[in-house]
């Protein structure tokens, strides 16, 4: 299994380096170079870097892919598609998915809404110091606790109902109430939580 790190254009205050492949998304490419990390892929329209910075990225990247600013995908979506084309079994961690433009953050939170990325949703994790975002397809999902993290929240894509079992606050037919996001729940004694979703996907 290939472990891929994608460095996007949001805040990059906390990241790890134990990966096989490093991907820079637009200005994230420059961040990798400035931190003396490999730049295996550089992907984006590169509208957030100067001409000199772009030339440096072109020179240093093993694979350089420049897209038109007028495109259907965000730079991060485009980078993920290129990664899964080459490494279809990869486990991908995205750093810098938060803390920048809010429209980019929202796009990152709903990556499985792209039909090309939906088949890979279980292979994508968004991570920073305070957050770990994962995606689960409809059905019964077993959510494992994360070291150092107490709280867990659930959001269903679309209007599907969900149930929560094994958490501090369970949700089933006896106490069901409808919300877009069920936030600030907690793991009990570091035990897994089971969430069942009728359709769509779980964030």
Residue ranges and their predicted role:
Residues 1-56:
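N-terminal beta-strand-loop-alpha-helix module at the start
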Residues 1-2, 20, 88-91, 122:
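Short coil/turn segments at beta-strand junctions that form active-site/ligand-binding loops
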Residues 6-8, 26, 95-97, 127, ...:
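Short beta-strand segments
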Residues 23-25, 65-66, 125-128:
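General beta-strand structural signal in soluble alpha/beta enzymes
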Residues 29-31, 49-51, 73, 101, ...:
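Short gly/pro/ser/thr-enriched loop/turn and capping motifs at secondary-structure boundaries
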Residues 64-87:
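Short phosphate-binding loop-to-helix
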Residues 91-139:
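Anionic-ligand-binding alpha/beta catalytic cores of soluble enzymes and soluble regulatory domains
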Residues 129-131, 136-203:
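Long, charged alpha-helical interface segments
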């Amino acid at each position: 299994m290939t472990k891929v790190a994608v460095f996007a254009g949001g805040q990059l205050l906390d990241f790890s380096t134990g990966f096989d492949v490093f991907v820079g998304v637009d200005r994230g490419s420059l961040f990798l170079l400035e931190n003396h990390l490999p730049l295996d892929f550089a992907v984006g329209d590169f509208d957030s870097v100067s001409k000199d910075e772009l030339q440096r990225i072109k020179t240093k990247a093993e694979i350089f892919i420049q897209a038109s600013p007028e495109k259907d995908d965000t730079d991060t979506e485009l980078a993920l598609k290129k990664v899964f084309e080459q490494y279809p079994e990869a486990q991908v961690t995205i750093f810098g998915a938060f803390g920048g433009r809010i429209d980019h953050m929202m796009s990152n939170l709903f990556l499985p809404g792209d039909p090309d990325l939906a088949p890979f949703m279980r292979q994508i994790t968004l991570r920073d110091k305070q957050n770990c975002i994962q995606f689960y397809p409809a059905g019964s999902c077993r959510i494992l606790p994360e070291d150092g993290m107490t709280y867990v929240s659930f959001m269903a894509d679309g209007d599907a109902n969900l149930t929560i079992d094994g958490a501090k606050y369970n949700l089933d037919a006896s106490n069901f109430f409808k919300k877009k996001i069920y936030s600030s729940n907690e793991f009990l004694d570091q035990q897994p939580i089971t969430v069942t979703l009728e359709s769509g996907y779980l964030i």
